[in-house]
């Protein structure tokens, strides 16, 4: 029994090996990955941004070692292991790298929503009361979507400036869960 315990590597050893095998995160790498950010990522807010990050720029480059503290570890451009509490540094770098593309996608999405909204408002057809109520309900939903997407745009900019709005906390929670190093 004691021999089995000795032969089995500890969780700490396995984690260290995994962390040492991470690929480095460079500014160039993050900047190059923005092309993979899609309108679908944007539409899903923090969950979408986290999915993008975990599948593209942070894949094989970041691990979360403590989900409750949201403590991330990654290698910098010099190969040094960086411990990032609350993943604040990497989140800021990531949102700075996608800032322009994200803004373009949000504007595109908002314009699509505005076109839909205008099509409801310019309908020359006579409607029943029920149809009018449906259009009003859909119009309200579209207005809410436009408002929330511009809030998301503002919060994304704030994150790239180092602030921590609601979107930041939701994003980091998703990243921590998705990159947790479990054995």
Located regions from the model:
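Extended amphipathic coiled-coil helices
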Residues: 2-183
